[in-house]
Swiss-Prot record:
InterPro entries: PsdUridine_synth_cat_dom_sf (IPR020103), PsdUridine_synth_TruA (IPR001406), PsdUridine_synth_TruA_a/b_dom (IPR020097), PsdUridine_synth_TruA_C (IPR020095), TruA/RsuA/RluB/E/F_N (IPR020094). Formation of pseudouridine at positions 38, 39 and 40 in the anticodon stem and loop of transfer RNAs. Substrate binds at residue 110. NCBIfam families: hisT_truA. Belongs to the tRNA pseudouridine synthase TruA family. This is tRNA pseudouridine synthase A. It catalyses: uridine(38/39/40) in tRNA = pseudouridine(38/39/40) in tRNA. Its EC number is 5.4.99.12. GO terms for biological process: tRNA pseudouridine synthesis.
Length: 241
């Protein structure tokens, strides 16, 4: 047996989440079924979990398979055949037997995409349509998140985290064409953390929440915002080992 790392992307609007779901509507379910068509029945392990409607341009999974799969490019081609059209396998690599796809991760990155153009139903599942805002101010507010923080008030219930401490390496906003993008990089994320963070920054920009309240929530003093930004604008964009 050998262990392989699968790098892939997926359209989150087609799934109930990335993890195994009832009625097999999770990304993990579809990818596991595709592997079974190729005679690979070992448990598929995922590096990250995303909620319903959240996308991934760069996700990672691992699985054990027979040593006879020596042509990984052929395996990639066949796996794409069975996971099409909402999952795309970008690369398959052989890894060491002790590789831990989840616990060996050094950092994860997410991007949240806003569109400031006219509403289009064809884009509605992939961006958050939102009026233009002060990008400089957004950058300033996002900067409050950088560093080692106890983000217990930026966490949905139901997570399996042993601690709510996280180190945020990057939290910034930038423009690309008619889009504004929030970029987050950290050693790990809590369930719902980014969507709660995005919604909190937007509330300050809208004047519905003060900077002081945002800082108090980041400093784990009190929760001032309970609302989450919609999932459709969020993308898992990088996982580093």
């Amino acid at each position: 047996m050998m262990k392989i790392k699968i790098i892939f992307s997926y359209d989150g609007s087609a799934f109930l989440g990335s993890a195994t779901q009832p009625h097999k509507k999770g990304v993990q379910d579809v990818l596991s079924e595709a592997l079974s068509h190729l005679g690979i029945f070992s448990p598929l392990l995922m590096a990250s979990r995303t909620d319903k409607g959240v996308h991934a341009s760069y996700a990672v999974a691992s699985v054990e398979c027979g040593d006879h799969f020596v042509n990984l490019e052929y395996l990639q081609k066949q796996l794409n055949k069975f996971s099409h059209p909402f999952i795309h396998i970008k690369k398959i690599e052989k890894v060491k037997d002790d590789f831990e796809v989840r616990f060996d991760v050094k950092s994860r990155e997410y991007r949240y995409i806003f569109s400031h153009s006219s509403y289009s139903p064809f884009m509605a599942s992939y961006v958050y349509f939102y009026p233009k805002f002060d990008l400089g101010k957004a950058n300033e507010l996002l900067g409050f998140f950088v560093g080692k923080k106890d983000l217990k008030f930026f966490c949905k219930s139901g997570g399996d985290n042993k601690t709510t401490l996280r180190e945020i390496f990057i939290a910034r906003a930038y423009a690309y064409k008619d889009f504004s993008i929030f970029h987050f990089k950290a050693n790990g994320f809590l369930r719902g953390q980014i969507r709660l963070s995005v919604a909190s920054v937007l509330k300050v920009l809208e004047g519905k929440m003060s900077e002081k309240e945002l800082k108090e929530q980041i400093e784990a003093k009190k929760q001032c915002n309970h609302f989450l930004a919609p999932p459709n604008g969020l993308y898992l964009s990088r996982i580093c080992y």
